[in-house]
Amino acid sequence: MSQSICSTGLRWLWLVVVVLIIDLGSKYLILQNFALGDTVPLFPSLNLHYARNYGAAFSFLADSGGWQRWFFAGIAIGISVILVVMMYRSKATQKLNNIAYALIIGGALGNLFDRLWHGFVVDMIDFYVGDWHFATFNLADTAICVGAALIVLEGFLPSKAKKQ
C-alpha cells in the first residue's frame, strides 16, 4: 500500500537540508577566512579555531593512512540510508524521533561532503575551560549529538508522548 510522503517521517527531511546549509555554510566561511590553525576568541571559553580532522570523533583513526576516509564515508552513507528508511516507516506525527533522525542525517551528510570533497572534516568550534580544551568540532557534529540525545530522551518518555 502506497502512503503519502507527508504522512511519513520523510516529511521532516526539510530539516536535513537546513542542517546541511548551516553546516556547509559555516565550514565555507572558515575555509575562506581562516588559515589552518587560526583562532579567534568569541566568548570566554569559546573560540573559532580552524582544524582539519582526518578521522572521526576526537580524531579517532586520524593517522591511519587514508583508508579511514572511505570507511567513515561508508558508515555515514549506511547510517543515513537506515535512518531515511526508519523515517519512511514512521508517522510524521512522531516528531521527536523524526527530528532526531533528520539531525543525525544532516550532520552525517555534512561531514560526508567534507570527507569526499576535501579529504578531511573541517572543524572550528573550540570549547575550553582554563588550559583544558575539548576536542574541536563543527555544527554537523553538534547536530549528530543533539539527534542522539533526542533518541535517548525519547526512550525515557511515557508511551503516549512517544506516539506523538
Swiss-Prot record:
It is a multi-pass membrane protein. It holds the Pfam family Peptidase_A8. GO terms for molecular function: aspartic-type endopeptidase activity. Pathway: Protein modification; lipoprotein biosynthesis (signal peptide cleavage). The active site is at residues 123, 141. Its EC number is 3.4.23.36. Its main location: membrane. PROSITE patterns: SPASE_II. Belongs to the peptidase A8 family. This protein specifically catalyzes the removal of signal peptides from prolipoproteins. This is Lipoprotein signal peptidase.
